Amino acid sequence: MTRTAPSSLRSLPAEGAAATDLLDTLQRGLAELDAQGLRRVRRTADTACDAHMRVDGRDIVGFASNDYLGLAAHPALVAAFAEGARRYGSGSGGSHLLGGHSRAHATLEDELAGFAGGFSDAPRALYFSTGYMANLAAMTALTGKHATIFSDALNHASLIDGIRLSRANVQVYPHADMAALAALLDASDAETKLIVSDTVFSMDGDIAPLAELVALAERHGAWLVVDDAHGFGVLGPQGRGALAAAALRSPNLIYVGTLGKAAGVAGAFVIAHETVIEWMIQRARSYIFTTAAPPAVAHAVSASLKVIAGDEGDARRAHLAALIERTRALLRMTRWQPVDSHTAVQPLVIGSNDATLAAMRSLDAHGLWVPAIRPPTVPAGTSRLRVSLSAAHSFDDLARLEAALIEASEGQTRRDAEQPPRSLRSLPPEGAAASLGAARRETAA
């Protein structure tokens, strides 16, 4: 009996042709990224995450990580990680619903709810392996075709991807524009309304108007989901986060936090009313269909919470606050445009990709790792250096950064002076000479 190939396969090109076509397409795409100065390159750390590291075989001062409290190499966390591995082994062995949920995970969830759940009368926490997975869960499990999501234009990519997967209607409001958001809410008759916002925006460092967001959510019967990835551990009393810093409480709140930044370990969590969390356990695909994080990680996070909430955490936050104010001042000494940020994220907007990469390379030559952030992470024309501060930094580190930034800024000024005006660069040589002569005559007159 002769079998006929499925119709979906009959139109495929000859063997190997499809693979070759794909490789050609990808190679052209990579070449375009190179031409635009947009290819990203990984650097390899040879030592623990800290202010002073060895990266790609060189000693550097790092201003790239999100280790805001300098806990990633803290002896107490390292010891707790080792203890957790001895007690629970190296892996969880399964998903949370199929054998992988350990006592370490359960204990951590209780601790997180008590630590950062003060905004709710009945808080419960759910631990995830990554912040990306936590945001996907919040967006997809709690919405659907019946819902409308109102999303800040500068929300993190993980929120945006979760929104796309949710199948909900989407309304994007201009960044932090509460009047625009109010108008969208007024016009909506959706059965379920979900307002979604970062607290600290990761590329600008500014903080969302949280009190106004809560008020709008309550006025319109909406839920408010806040992603406090860059605020948890740093903002508020004892580092309890952005909601605690603003003294906000509401039954309409859902709080997402991450544990690989200020907490110095890994993972993320969602805190909400216990009914919301129980529903997420039943319906959040990014929670259900993945192996649970190693219990040793959760055990180390429990140790981190003790440091964050204690006197040492207060001292680290105070030092970080002083570093932030000093950095704000030194960034204003360059030719570029600092963003008005009062958080550990201190961006310096340069503009073009080429100029931003040149500044990054200039700093790198001085042993300073300050990453260049380019599209699509930020809008075209706003490429920037992102100075990320840690309590592990010293004021001597900032003095080195200041000197190197001033040199990079002056170098850009010299390069600009050496180039002809933009209007002349595309002219042929004879036209350029004639136009330049005319310009000189006009100036002399």
Curated annotation (Swiss-Prot):
EC number(s) per entry: 2.3.1.47
Enzyme class: transferase
Binding site for substrate: R40, H156, T377
Record-listed pyridoxal 5'-phosphate binding positions: G131, Y132, S202, H230, T258
Catalytic activity, reaction form: 6-carboxyhexanoyl-[ACP] + L-alanine + H(+) = (8S)-8-amino-7-oxononanoate + holo-[ACP] + CO2
Keywords: Biotin biosynthesis, Pyridoxal phosphate, Transferase
Pfam families: Aminotran_1_2
Segments of this protein annotated with the region Disordered: 408-445
GO molecular function per UniProt: 8-amino-7-oxononanoate synthase activity; pyridoxal phosphate binding
Keyword Oxidoreductase in record: no
Pathway field: Cofactor biosynthesis; biotin biosynthesis
Required cofactor names: pyridoxal 5'-phosphate
GO BP, sorted A to Z: biotin biosynthetic process
UniProt modified residues of type N6-(pyridoxal phosphate)lysine: K261
Similarity remark: Belongs to the class-II pyridoxal-phosphate-dependent aminotransferase family. BioF subfamily.
HAMAP family registered for this protein in UniProt: BioF_aminotrans_2
Subunit structure: Homodimer.
Role summary: Catalyzes the decarboxylative condensation of pimeloyl-[acyl-carrier protein] and L-alanine to produce 8-amino-7-oxononanoate (AON), [acyl-carrier protein], and carbon dioxide.
PANTHER family tied to this protein: 8-AMINO-7-OXONONANOATE SYNTHASE, CLASS II AMINOTRANSFERASE/8-AMINO-7-OXONONANOATE SYNTHASE
The protein, known as: 8-amino-7-oxononanoate synthase
Organism per entry: Burkholderia ambifaria (strain MC40-6)
Classification of source organism: Bacteria, Pseudomonadati, Pseudomonadota, Betaproteobacteria, Burkholderiales
